[in-house]
Amino acid sequence: MPRFALTVIRHGETRLNKEKIIQGQGVDAPLSETGFRQAAAAGQFLSNVQFTHAFSSDLTRTKQTIHGILEKSRFCKDMAVKYDSRLRERMYGVAEGKPLSELRAMAKAAGEECPMFTPPGGETVEQVKMRGKDFFDFICQLILGKAGQRESVLPGAPGSGLESSLAEVFPVGKHGSLGANPKGGTLGLAASILVVSHGAYMRSLFGYFLSDLRCSLPGARDKLELSSITPNTGISVFIIDCEEARQPSIQCVCMNLQEHLNGVTEKQH
């Protein structure tokens, strides 16, 4: 039963984030100065973590963020990033480029809650969920060896260094457990995957983990936190056990971590 770690990070701040303008997929804004500092801070925080794979949305703000993170890495500075359109932000149609207040007004006029409302030309919540599920199924199959030969699937040399490097950054008791092997013994990670994506997309993905895969949460966390928007460069870590022809099991180690932002930017709520 292969086991892997999944670290999911939201992109750094853009000027439009600060101004509460909907970006979606059609407004491809770069990071602001604050956003670049956030990416560097996240990279410094994760600098001792060994990743075997790196994936990012193909939009500018996520590309700049993942490169800012990897630049600080002791082990992954030269790692190739795979850009995947399945990791893009939710498409908001006619609301893109407009203030969040206008989207809320559209939703109110339609008699719907804003997170569930689909603007004309936008993606439904279910469509975003299916994109997330498709990507997650892909990485599970990648780890199971179905995407090619084993030697090409795990380019980053899996081994005991993966779990020890994670445990240094996310110590047991502070951020929850890195997960005991259900069959006993060591954690035995086959891979450690870094993903950089977007706020609404990540909320949908985490909701899928909770509702469909029955993700277990660290002690003090609740379901509301899993369904909230991740702050810019907020870090969430999951441990996944995958097995052929069976639903993966998933454990949340930490959710929306932002302690690396102390002194970089005000915490976002």
From Swiss-Prot:
Catalyzed reaction equations = beta-D-fructose 2,6-bisphosphate + H2O = beta-D-fructose 6-phosphate + phosphate
Active site (catalytic residues): 11 (tele-phosphohistidine intermediate), 89 (proton donor/acceptor)
Q: Nucleus: is it a keyword of this entry?
A: yes
Q: Name one GO biological process term.
A: negative regulation of reactive oxygen species metabolic process
Q: Where is this site: Transition state stabilizer?
A: 198
**Observed phenotype of the null mutant:** Mice are viable and fertile and show no obvious developmental defects. Following intestine ablation by gamma irradiation, adult mice display a reduction in the size and number of proliferating intestinal crypts and an increase in cell death. Mice display reduced intestinal tumor progression compared to wild-type mice.
Highest taxon, organism lineage: Eukaryota
Give the record's subunit note.
Answer: Interacts with HK2; the interaction increases hexokinase HK2 activity in a hypoxia- and HIF1A-dependent manner, resulting in the regulation of mitochondrial membrane potential, thus increasing NADPH production and decreasing intracellular ROS levels.
Q: What is this protein called?
A: Fructose-2,6-bisphosphatase TIGAR
Origin species: Mus musculus (Mouse)
Gene that this sequence comes from: Tigar
